[in-house]
């Protein structure tokens, strides 16, 4: 080994030892008769002292920041008053006798711990990863995966790998396709998840499976998504919903306790999908901001205000939420901004009032009685603001108000977004209508067990034995009890409009397995990238992935995706169309 110790290892107890350290030159300071180098590696930092009479002193003239060096020297206690309490090695320094330059660095585009634009950080990711922030995040990620593996091992789970080259079964996002050279015109697909394989493992008798696995989705990348991502994939046989939730809570609690020393209260809260939509306008609620949506129809019974009256006559709803102590921010200009945002979200407009010494609102002339009713019933206090909207589509109304609630919360109440709000969302509808495909699609996936009493021909009434875990408004995991009866699986395919021959073409190998003994089973998949980002306090998953893609799926470091050699395309019998 070139080194005897790391840069974060030496302590006062090592005083007098001859040591060799290797690392990057973080900083150089010249105080005349003595020169100091802060030497850094992933373990920490050590101060190197180069006295004027040493060979090491002369070598410093050749050094540049971020050069990689080997230092030989002796450990000594720092003089009293010069200790650095901010680093683990702050009580000692190494008096250098020799410095060997292993790799001299040219001037860098930026230096670790600087914060250039993200494009620059991604282009030179190997420099960015030297920063303390990124180093801590990557180490945290490793520690979390280590805890997860240990947890499942203790419970008797087996970590089993599943194929990356598999069959395309397009449901939901597009597959990444891989052409086969040996079978021209045929394609593999990279897995969007190991869903079918983990169910086949249950059918194979491996009753407790987990895997930390890469997954791939060729989708239009929304904010903070990646085309390749990592799941903690879990499946169990002979279980019900309570079993899966209990094991999942144990994993999350263990991760928080061992990774960041935080004890979580279990079991976690649970709310139904319906309750989440009614109170928060989303199935991924962040409850830390408060401001629950409220049904305000009672205040508008018999109203003469035409806009709301017409909505109510059509069977629509009136809802709103209270923003506490927001009156000083709620100017006419702010009201106009929120009005425009409400229209962007599909609402006809927005009504608002604030409580000061009296009620203030541009709508007061027409709605004073209604506002006073709301103030009394909802116990509004001076300084509170109430935002109100009406629409005949209750789902749209909930979602639009939920978005406004969250945007106001993040902009004005970020001080409330402390800690971790963890809950389960349960009792999902099985199907949702896809405007793009003009048909009902499975909200989770078509292998989810329905609540059998609800399984009929009316898509809107079918419930799923599905569950999502949400932390701070992000879906961190989702799963379900799976179908283990062939007739139910065929019924679901039929409700999805999938013909028998189409189902056989896509899932024949899977349906064949249903003939030969399928245990009741269920599972869950956690998004590791998102879980780590939340625990690290990062807003973007790119901050916890060593080599992420940009928002449009490009690797700025390598230039992927890129053109390939014409010979490779000919071997695959692929022709690229221009434009």
Swiss-Prot record:
Transmembrane segments: none annotated. Keywords: Aminoacyl-tRNA synthetase, ATP-binding, Cytoplasm, Ligase, Nucleotide-binding, Protein biosynthesis. It holds the Pfam family GAD. SUPFAM superfamilies: Class II aaRS and biotin synthetases (SSF55681), GAD domain-like (SSF55261), Nucleic acid-binding proteins (SSF50249). It is found in: Cytoplasm. The keyword Iron does not apply. The record marks 81 as: Important for tRNA non-discrimination. ATP binds at residues 217-219, 226, 475, 527-530. Signal peptide: none annotated. GO terms for biological process: aspartyl-tRNA aminoacylation. Residues 195-198 are annotated as: Aspartate. It catalyses: tRNA(Asx) + L-aspartate + ATP = L-aspartyl-tRNA(Asx) + AMP + diphosphate. It is an enzyme of class 6 (ligase). L-aspartate binds at residues 171, 217, 444, 482. One of its GO terms (molecular function) is ATP binding. InterPro entries: Aa-tRNA-synt_II (IPR004364), aa-tRNA-synth_II (IPR006195), aa-tRNA-synth_II/BPL/LPL (IPR045864), Asp-tRNA-ligase_1 (IPR004524), Asp-tRNA-ligase_1_N (IPR047089), Asp/Asn-tRNA-synth_IIb (IPR002312), AspRS_core (IPR047090), GAD-like_sf (IPR004115). Its EC number is 6.1.1.23. Its main location: cytoplasm. Belongs to the class-II aminoacyl-tRNA synthetase family. Type 1 subfamily. Aspartyl-tRNA synthetase with relaxed tRNA specificity since it is able to aspartylate not only its cognate tRNA(Asp) but also tRNA(Asn). Reaction proceeds in two steps: L-aspartate is first activated by ATP to form Asp-AMP and then transferred to the acceptor end of tRNA(Asp/Asn). This is Aspartate--tRNA(Asp/Asn) ligase. The lineage of its organism: Bacteria, Thermotogati, Thermotogota, Thermotogae, Thermotogales.
């Amino acid at each position: 080994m070139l080194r005897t110790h790391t840069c974060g290892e030496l302590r006062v107890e090592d005083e007098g030892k001859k040591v060799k350290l290797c690392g990057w030159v973080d900083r150089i300071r010249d105080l005349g008769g003595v020169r100091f180098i802060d030497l850094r590696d992933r373990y920490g930092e050590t101060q190197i002292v180069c006295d004027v009479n040493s060979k090491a002193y002369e070598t410093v003239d050749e050094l540049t920041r971020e050069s990689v060096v080997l230092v030989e020297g002796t450990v000594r206690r720092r003089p009293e008053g010069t200790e650095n309490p901010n680093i683990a090695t702050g009580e000692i320094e190494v008096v250098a006798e020799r410095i060997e330059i292993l790799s001299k660095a040219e001037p860098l585009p930026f230096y670790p711990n600087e914060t250039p634009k993200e494009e620059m950080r991604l282009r030179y990711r190997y420099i960015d990863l030297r920063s303390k922030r990124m180093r801590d995040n990557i180490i945290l990620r490793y520690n979390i995966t280590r805890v997860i593996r240990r947890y499942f091992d203790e419970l008797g789970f087996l970590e089993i790998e599943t194929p990356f080259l598999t069959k395309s079964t397009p449901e939901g996002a597009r597959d990444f396709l891989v052409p086969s050279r040996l079978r021209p015109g045929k394609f593999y697909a990279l897995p969007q998840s190991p869903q079918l394989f983990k169910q086949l493992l249950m059918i194979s008798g491996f009753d407790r499976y987990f895997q930390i696995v890469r997954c791939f989705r060729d989708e239009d990348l929304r904010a903070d998504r990646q085309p390749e991502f990592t799941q903690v994939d879990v499946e169990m046989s002979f279980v019900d919903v309570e079993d899966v939730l209990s094991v999942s809570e144990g994993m999350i609690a263990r991760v928080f306790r061992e990774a960041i020393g935080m004890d979580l209260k279990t079991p976690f809260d649970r709310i139904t999908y319906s309750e989440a939509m009614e109170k928060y306008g989303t199935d991924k609620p962040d409850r830390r901001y408060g401001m629950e949506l409220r049904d305000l129809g009672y205040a508008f019974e018999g109203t003469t205000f035409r806009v709301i009256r017409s909505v109510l006559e059509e069977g629509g709803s009136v809802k709103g939420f209270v923003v506490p102590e927001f009156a000083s921010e709620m100017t006419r200009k702010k009201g106009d901004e929120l009005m425009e945002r409400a229209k962007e979200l599909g609402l006809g407009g927005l009504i608002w009032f604030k409580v000061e010494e009296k009620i203030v609102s541009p709508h007061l002339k027409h709605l004073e009685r209604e506002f006073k009713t709301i103030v009394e019933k909802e116990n509004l206090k001076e300084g509170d603001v109430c935002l109100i909207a009406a629409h005949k589509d209750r789902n749209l109304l909930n979602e639009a108000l939920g978005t406004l609630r969250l945007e106001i919360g993040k902009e004005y109440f970020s001080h409330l977004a402390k800690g971790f709000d963890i809950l389960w969302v349960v009792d999902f509808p099985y199907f949702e209508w896809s405007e793009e495909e003009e048909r009902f699609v499975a909200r989770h996936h078509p292998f989810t067990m329905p609540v059998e009493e609800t399984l009929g021909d009316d898509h809107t009434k079918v419930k799923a034995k599905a569950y999502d875990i949400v932390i701070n408004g992000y879906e961190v995991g989702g799963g379900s009890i799976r179908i283990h009866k062939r007739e139910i699986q065929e019924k679901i395919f039929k409700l999805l409009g999938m013909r028998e021959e189409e189902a056989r073409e896509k899932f024949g190998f899977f349906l064949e397995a249903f003939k030969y003994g399928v245990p009741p089973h269920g599972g869950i998949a956690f998004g590791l990238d998102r879980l780590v980002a939340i625990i690290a306090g990062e807003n973007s998953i790119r901050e916890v992935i060593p080599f992420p893609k940009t928002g449009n799926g490009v690797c700025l470091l390598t230039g992927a995706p890129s053109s390939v050699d014409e010979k490779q395309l000919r071997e695959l019998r692929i022709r690229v169309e221009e434009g």
